[in-house]
Amino acid sequence: MPDPDSTLAARLLRIRGRVQGVSYRASAQREAQRLGLSGWVRNRHDGSVEALVCGPADTVERFIAWAHVGPPAASVSAIEVGDAAPTDGAGFDCLPTC
């Protein structure tokens, strides 16, 4: 049986609430880098933030827990989480708004 700590996961998050204009993307990038995750984060035109987070399953879950709170100025009202295909690269990027 595989060690659950070594199981890789990729999750696509859509974060809603007051999450733009409050440094949510920059904070998410710092948190993902601190945790050693790969992926990206970007603003959406509908006012939400979207993130693709890849790494060990337990660490991805820790990022998701952080995302429910976000930086101090944010007010997260909801997060949708879905499975995703992992990214090909390393690092965690802030992408342009889409």
UniProtKB/Swiss-Prot annotation:
Gene3D superfamilies: 3.30.70.100. GO terms for molecular function: acylphosphatase activity. It is an enzyme of class 3 (hydrolase). The keyword Cytoplasm does not apply. It catalyses: an acyl phosphate + H2O = a carboxylate + phosphate + H(+). Coiled coil: none annotated. The active site is at R25, N43. Its EC number is 3.6.1.7. Keywords: Hydrolase. PROSITE patterns: ACYLPHOSPHATASE_2, ACYLPHOSPHATASE_3. Residues 10-96 form the Acylphosphatase-like domain. Belongs to the acylphosphatase family. This is Acylphosphatase. The gene is acyP.
